[in-house]
């Protein structure tokens, strides 16, 4: 469309963006942290499915005990670790602070605590494997201790980052609620 100033009206060439509003930083942070936490929850779901599959296969005796070892005691309470992740997912759509706090606390209780107990439970067998090279439990030909410790290292990192990002998300949400109260 032509104008008096030339072939294009002034301000329509894309140079008028400086005055436009921007998204507040805590909203940007909230969106990115929700995305990161969702990725961690999906990683946790994969770990949970591996442990649940190992437990189902061993309890239902689908394969011999030589192929898949019986589960350790820490694996049973770890199965409850799916509940905190569900609370975390439920808290996202409406920025529900109480569900996120429940998710953070129960992640420590149902996820981190069983992993710490599992580390202590398997330590004597890991020591025996290290000193004498003897393993008595196997998962598909690999030492069950080695496989479970590897899984535990990944799980601790996933849950640790999940709690860290949840705390940062909680701070971003509190910033948002404090600004609303001031108005």
Curated annotation (Swiss-Prot):
Keyword Protein transport: yes
Pfam families according to UniProt: Jagunal
GO biological process, one term: granulocyte colony-stimulating factor signaling pathway
InterPro entries registered for this protein in UniProt: Jagunal
Location(s), subcellular: Endoplasmic reticulum membrane
Membrane topology value: Multi-pass membrane protein
Principal location listed in the UniProt entry: endoplasmic reticulum
Keywords: Endoplasmic reticulum, Immunity, Membrane, Protein transport, Transmembrane, Transmembrane helix, Transport
Stated role: Endoplasmic reticulum transmembrane protein involved in vesicle-mediated transport, which is required for neutrophil function.
Alphabetized PANTHER family for the sequence: PROTEIN JAGUNAL HOMOLOG 1
Stated family: Belongs to the jagunal family.
Protein name: Protein jagunal homolog 1
